[in-house]
Amino acid sequence: MSIPHSAKQSSPLSSRRRSVTNTTPLLTPRHSRDNSSTQISSAKNITSSSPSTITNESSKRNKQNLVLSTSFISTKRLENSAPSPTSPLMARRTRSTMTKALLNLKAEINNQYQELARLRKKKDDIEHLRDSTISDIYSGSYSTNHLQKHSMRIRANTQLREIDNSIKRVEKHIFDLKQQFDKKRQRSLTTSSSIKADVGSIRNDDGQNNDSEELGDHDSLTDQVTLDDEYLTTPTSGTERNSQQNLNRNSTVNSRNNENHSTLSIPDLDGSNKVNLTGDTEKDLGDLENENQIFTSTTTEAATWLVSDYMQSFQEKNVNPDFIAQKANGLVTLLKEHSEIRKDLVLTSFMSSIQNLLLNGNKLIAASAYRVCRYLINSSIFIDELLELRLDAFIIISLAKDNSFQIEREQALKMVRRFIEYNNGVTQGIMQAIISCVEKPEDSLRHMALETLLELCFVAPEMVKECRGMRVIEGFLQDYTSFSLASVILDTILQLMATHKTRQHFLEDFNVSVLTTVFSDTNTKSNVNVEKMQNASTLISITLNSYNGFMLFSNNNFKPLKQLVSFFQIPICAQYLIDIFLDVLKIKPLPYKPRGRHSHSFKPIPSQYYKECMSVNQRLALIVLILENSEFVPHLLELLNEEDRDDHLVAKGRYLLTEYFNLRMNLVDKKYTSVSKPIYKENFTYVNETFQFKKIAYKMNRNRNTIGMSGIDYAQNIKSFSKNIKENTLLREVDDFRFRRMVYDSKVLQTKDFTRWNWNIINELLEGPLLNKKQLEELVKSTKFIRRLLVFYRPLRLRFSNVNKGAKLSQKYVQVGCQFFKTLTATPEGMKILMDDTKIIPQLASLMFRAMEGNISGNIFNKNKLREKIIFGYFKFIGILTQSKNGVHILTRWNFFTVIYKMFQFESKLGLEFLLLTIPELDLKYSSHCRVIIGKALVVANEKVRIEATKHIGDKLKELLSTKESDLKLKANKVKLQQFKMEMLTRQLYDLSPSVVAVADQALYECIVAGNGSEELGTSFRMFLNQMVFIRSPILFELLSRPYGFQLLNEINFVKEERDSWLSKKNIEYVHIVEEFLKKNESINAKSLTFQQKSRLPLHFYESLTKTEDGILLLSQTGDLVTFMNVIKKYVNGNNMATVENAKEILDLKAALWCVGFIGSTELGIGLLDNYSLVEDIIEVAYNASVTSVRFTAFYVLGLISMTREGCEILDEMGWNCCVSVQDEPIGIALPNRLDRFLSYNEHKWSAFGEYSDEMIVFNKSDGDLIEKCLPIEFDLDKLLKEKDTAENPLNEKIITNKYDNDITSQTITVSGENSSLFANEGLSSPYVTQYRNDDDSIESKVLHIVSQLGNHILSNHAVKEITEINNKYGPRLFENEKMFFKVFNMMSKYRFKPHVRKFLCGLFINNRALENVIRHDNKRDKRPANFTR
């Protein structure tokens, strides 16, 4: 297939040459794409005529004779290719009506195909979204995530049905259009053939013309040229200059590309027909500006031709940088749009052109070359070919340049990053160049180079280690001013320590104590930089909150951590250390705010450990144990015992110490920790200090309980106890005298002003004495006490009904009113009072009914009164009346239920508000009306009402389940009511509103989790199980953990399907979810739970399964435990546990560990683990796994196993300590007795038994003798001398005064294999090598020795002076020959030089001129032909 090209017309300015005006480049920068008219090049470069001789008439003719530019199109046309018109005007031929109809049909078919592709893509996206919601792993506490996913599945299924219908419609429409197209095509065959012949003859005539030279002026490249990742942007030039040559593209394009570019193929539905349109489908070329646009639908074949043309244009010499930049932009854009053509190109034929571009001194041209190479890379093989072309040397030279070459250096670094993607091509020399960029503070590419270096730590850790890259990275951690950068580096280092692959190279090079240098410098500085101290504290806290972080701080018997806590002796550092450990122990977050503002207000808050998941507390217990072994308490006590103490600092220290002891007692062991040294000061007694500790301890523990006792509700117990005492005392022990005294003290009889009444005494009377039949009757007959209370609560008296919500005793009025109606309905005398009263209930019924009718004038039930007054209290009174048969009788007598039914009409907003206030107060036990009302509210159209009714049913069900009835009749009634409420609640699972479903689902979940479930519940669940499975409710897992629930779920095949799902994918998904959960809970802020339930790990299928005997039986029959066991034992017994880091194997191992852990966390499952000795294998993983996350997964799993007594016994036998509660019950925390084994990396084992004890010599002050015999400290003198030599001569070069070794190879400099042939064959004709005399080797040795001295900052100044003198004497003959190039190049690759030294060496030795000699030598050595294939 060929690209249509234009023939050229003769210009009136010259009869010998053709003038061709240039169009805008084929691929232009974004900012240069405009619609400006194409400039016409001047004729002064073609003829001797001046521009003034050109007449207006000739100019017009020139504009009319504009032709397409062919600077990038070959004049040779492939066979069977369609000819192009001789000019844009010739393409404007009249089309027939049939041709237009075919074109319109073709366009419409294409549009329909695009629409079909769009619909199918949309369908795929929706299916992917729907499939992502299928897998549900429930969180430990209730959430509505499963309902959100359920709603997403429903929406996705609805959208899929609609899209399927749309796809069918589009396919039918395409079929109809193709039928029309086929019919019209048959009638137009003759016409199309004639048109094709006519156009072909015209193009064949034009095809004989030759290509003409494009002329134009270029704007010069300015220094402000910038380069982004999309284009090399240059100022837009009017024309471009191409060499006058015929391009032969047959060498770079496969023969299979010989197809017609202008042929349109439209497949039929059956795939058998193909429509060919030639001339009639060509684009109208009438307007020249239309040709200046980028080809938007370039075919693969045409793109291949254009790539070849771009590459040919790079071979031209002495071209303007703008031209190269625009061609590079075009080539890159083409490669982006047609990446498939890369494999069809033979690139070796023009890679020499890339070399020439890189050798060009212009930064824009070099940047263009880098960018083109970057987009041509598609394999490691091609990268190897680039390295053979010395691309690594080019990159090193570019990176050594200053910031004025930003555009070139940026592209060179991006080229390195492209190498990283293929894990190939990054040499040691490139690594040193990147490190040099990182070391230079003023380098504009410093952060980009640092990012690259951090990536190389994962890709090529060994090379980074050889180049001592970690030392450079460590330097950024000491620059606390850039906290965001330091935190990223710290996170990267911690990740490097996570696996053996990278850890083995950096563990010895990285010293975690570098984070504490800011504290070390505090003693030597008068002023403390608060921002640096806060940033350092935050970094230390981040480190200690990560697994690898506290393993690094625990290294060498906790030596780094001991160094850290020793800074408690410095008061300035102590305040920051306290903040750090408060954060690490999850007591209180760091108080630092942005911009270094410190929060000086100190408010102690209690730790929330008792609300946390036990796995989170297990990690916290480990940190407490680490601090216990790091002399944390003694150093903190020394701070509190300072003579000159800061009271604020001491208060924080007490707070930290108190909370630390609390955590230690609850999470580590139940023994109290004794303080060895009492805190004492002359005027600050031991008793006072004890009082301060007691005060803060009481304050912290006031609202929390010891672990194991948290289930005891002391407040509720006290309330129940006081209530019973009050009832018994008031009922039995109140005599007549005291009763009369209480009535008198209430002041109800003395005054009608209710604000002066003693409402507490009134409430005591209603709760006690007035429940006595005799006393109530006496009070009614002899006083107006009851009457005045009735009058107070009558709506139309405007006493109670006129009290504001914000009044002092407003809630007391409501509370006493509820007790008043409860007391009256409890006795016959009270019922008589209510039956005789014709005011309160009738007025309420009348006022509410009138309000719903719209009569709110003078009515207390209106919108404003409901908002401002305590009118809601009347609805509570109605609820009290529904709680007894007598109360229901009162409501029935005054037809109050009719008023409630009226509320459902929703004729006014007041009716809805009344209903929302009434529903929560109704009791369902005594009135069928109430049950009907609630049933109606559950299905009413208004969503708010349904939510409120569903919530009310759930609350009443939990309340009913918590009560116990001893009477058989009452028990039977309770079961019936329970079934009714359960049925009503489970029906709500079918509601169309997700909010209603969520309320019902949560209520059912809470009922089961609370442990109040029974087989009666299971019977009620039976008919709704399928719906629960449909919405994927977490109730299913709670049911699965109960015997009756397992049977129900097994009947509907849920257990088998869920098991298959977990084995296939959910076990792996659980690993990611639980790790995210544990990471999220590293933060201090405790999550507020929606109901009283302790935080738990995400629910696991095998945990619920193994809580029943049926589940254990199923587990044994299926062999799942054996499968998990095999995965673990394969890892443990594979003899490569210390190095296995395959991602899939590690993920499978973690999944198996969690499964085994949850099986072992149950009373029935732990026996299975003991049978297979799995606990021992898990401990082995915890001690020796190479991947840190695997080690801590085993740690958490052992904590799960310790949740049973039998599990604790097994772990105790194997050297792990299990924590128990005050009731001697396991709490699920297991800690290793050998912390050194658990916290040691396999690459650096350490022991806590004396191997790293500090040698101390202690003298007796009286006689000067040694107190105890200590071994003398031995010094390794050879090692000290070696370190001294290394410091003075880091390059390890032999220093010989006034003498230089003639043999450079005898030094530590080595020559790579690829350059060895250069030294072995010096007989090649070289402009410099052949001129050497015998003494030249000694000069080279001298130069290289001087170069080695440049690495020593003491000798560098003299070396620069000396090498400059040699350069002035010998010049390029010595400094730019290829032999010296490679020797200096290898030295720069092997040794570290400062950035300014590297720039100096590159200017002398590693420059373009020397590199050009090397490339010339390579070409002669290889005798490479001009074109060859790989």
Curated annotation (Swiss-Prot):
Briefly state the modifications made to the protein after translation. Phosphorylated by TOR2; when part of TORC2.
Annotated region Disordered: where?
1-62, 182-285
Alphabetized InterPro entries for the sequence: ARM-like (IPR011989), ARM-type_fold (IPR016024), Pianissimo_fam (IPR028268), Pianissimo_N (IPR028267), Rictor_IV (IPR029453), RICTOR_M (IPR029451), RICTOR_V (IPR029452)
Q: Name one GO biological process term.
A: TOR signaling
* Chief location category: membrane
What does the record's miscellaneous section state?
Present with 1840 molecules/cell in log phase SD medium.
Residue ranges, compositional bias (Polar residues): 7-26, 35-44, 233-265
The record's Gene3D superfamilies line, in alphabetical order, gives: Leucine-rich Repeat Variant (1.25.10.10)
N-terminal Ras-GEF domain: residues covered: 995-1100
> Subcellular location, in the record's words?
Cell membrane; Vacuole membrane
Q: Which GO-annotated molecular functions does the record name?
A: guanyl-nucleotide exchange factor activity; molecular adaptor activity; protein-membrane adaptor activity
- SMART domains, per the entry: RasGEF_N_2, RICTOR_M, RICTOR_N, RICTOR_V
| Annotated function | Essential component of TORC2, which regulates cell cycle-dependent polarization of the actin-cytoskeleton and cell wall integrity. TORC2 controls polarity of the actin cytoskeleton, which is required for orienting the secretory pathway toward discrete growth sites, via the RHO1/PKC1/MAPK cell integrity pathway. TSC11 may exert its functions through two distinct mechanisms, one mediated by AVO1 and the other mediated by AVO2 and SLM1.
Identification of the protein by name: Target of rapamycin complex 2 subunit TSC11
From the UniProt record, list the coiled-coil ranges.
91-180
Post-translational modification Phosphoserine, affected residues: 19, 81, 84, 87, 141
Q: Where is the composition biased (Low complexity)?
A: 45-57
Task: Name the gene that codes for it.
Answer: TSC11
The species is Saccharomyces cerevisiae (strain ATCC 204508 / S288c) (Baker's yeast)
Q: How does it sit in the membrane?
A: Peripheral membrane protein
Q: How does it assemble?
A: The target of rapamycin complex 2 (TORC2) is composed of at least AVO1, AVO2, BIT61, LST8, TOR2 and TSC11. TORC2 forms a homodimer. Contrary to TORC1, TORC2 does not bind to and is not sensitive to FKBP-rapamycin. TSC11 binds to the N-terminal HEAT repeat region in TOR2 and is required for TORC2 integrity by tethering AVO1 and AVO2 to the complex.
Q: Does the keyword Coiled coil apply?
A: yes
| Similarity comment | Belongs to the RICTOR family.
Enumerate the UniProt keywords alphabetically: Cell membrane, Coiled coil, Guanine-nucleotide releasing factor, Membrane, Phosphoprotein, Vacuole
Looking at the UniProt record for this protein, which Gene Ontology cellular component terms does it annotate, in alphabetical order?
Answer: cytosol; plasma membrane; TORC2 complex; vacuolar membrane
